Amino acid sequence: MTKLIKNGTIVTATDIYEADLLIQDGKIAVIGRNLDESGAEVIDATGCYVFPGGIDPHTHLDMPFGGTVTKDDFESGTIAAAFGGTTTIIDFCLTNKGEPLKKAIETWHNKATGKAVIDYGFHLMISEITDDVLEELPKVIEEEGITSFKVFMAYKDVFQADDGTLYRTLVAAKELGALVMVHAENGDVIDYLTKKALEDGHTDPIYHALTRPPELEGEATGRACQLTELAGSQLYVVHVSCAQAVEKIAEARNKGLNVWGETCPQYLVLDQSYLEKPNFEGAKYVWSPPLREKWHQEVLWNALKNGQLQTLGSDQCSFDFKGQKELGRGDFTKIPNGGPIIEDRVSILFSEGVKKGRITLNQFVDIVSTRIAKLFGLFPKKGTIAVGADADLVIFDPTVERVISAETHHMAVDYNPFEGMKVTGEPVSVLCRGEFVVRDKQFVGKPGYGQYVKRAKYGALMADQDVVKMS
């Protein structure tokens, strides 16, 4: 049915204006003032912003890790995302050495099909570069529309790839038009530090942070940037948590390299002291990279403001405190890494960023949606409000105040790392391809409505000035 959103203030990455939006066949059909209401369902957005739907470039739903599986699957995870103002996610498809990439991708399709309530795509993890993998990658891009590959520089003996694998992936990505993503921590040194800590009898959650110091994130980030320069390729550094990594990304961008940086809300508002909470509650805040000392927060905020970091992902990777995080009692290395973040990503950036004057409203939209769409081959179908774009829209009340709590969130976990935090602004209604998923803060979507999205190659949808040194 045709829908007409009236009386809202439309906000994109570049503009703010008052207009009506006419939606037909899942697309934005007309943008204008005082549009004809006949035959349309009218939605009144008085007092609200209308944003492009958020895009979360970093989720781990229904993912095995550390002897267990993340609690949120593609149903609960995408429902929570929708309540938070996200209409598209890109999840990480894990691969196994020696196994065809196609098999891993089929596994991830099976996890999502019939469950997702919003649209989704996949990144592909690269754990080894063999002749078979190199032969399969062009098919992955052409047939599956997967145009981003992730390499882990940490998690020794689990996910970690060596530098040769990273370099060869960068070279292949340049030739194929893909974007390489890295988890940048020095896994070899972390492996040594964690073993030494345990030998010395240090088992508490705080040692997760103390054995993964920011210097090791900075070192790995710099190494990845140098390999990117050598390969003449493109790099996206995920979940940047510290000043040392920001510095290396800024250096690379100032040299004109195609290097991009993502941070996450947890690094903007939480700090290392949370890992010292008594009664093992610090385990709730164990993820990698770890939370840093508080002073890093303003460095990250300034990097978002100045364009040294460009996007905000959630790194959604949720485990229950009881029964899952508790697997690490007596050994911090056994605590499943990750947290439930997907639902609060947009609200935290708006409340702590826009409301507190750290970033502008246009920057906010760019950081949670538009830039991600451009980098990952979704723009202009997604990530903007324009005629012909998917009607992925968030009607957002900027005045509502609420307190984040596990009692009211929609994630399938027994805690929220932002428990008790007051935020201003929240989504009222959320549409994905013109259909309500959330309406008046009530879930009205359907599992299975979400569609798999094939993505364009890196750079195909970006203007030249977007690719290099875009601030």
Swiss-Prot record:
Q: What is its EC number?
A: 3.5.2.-
**What does UniProt say on post-translational modification here?**
Carboxylation allows a single lysine to coordinate two zinc ions.
Write down how the cofactor binds this protein.
Answer: Binds 2 Zn(2+) ions per subunit. Can also use Ni(2+), Co(2+) or Mn(2+).
SUPFAM superfamilies in the cross-refs: Composite domain of metallo-dependent hydrolases, Metallo-dependent hydrolases
Q: How does activity depend on temperature?
A: The optimal activity is at pH 8.8 for manganese-containing form and pH 8.5 for cobalt-containing form. The oligomer is thermostable and retains full initial activity at 40-60 degrees Celsius.
Its GO CC terms are:
cytosol
Record-annotated residues binding Zn(2+) 2? K150, H183, H239
- Function summary: Catalyzes the stereospecific hydrolysis of the cyclic amide bond of D-hydantoin. Has no activity on dihydropyrimidines.
Annotated protein name in UniProt = D-hydantoinase
Q: Which organism is it from?
A: Geobacillus stearothermophilus (Bacillus stearothermophilus)
Per the UniProt record, the lineage of the source organism begins with: Bacteria, Bacillati, Bacillota, Bacilli, Bacillales
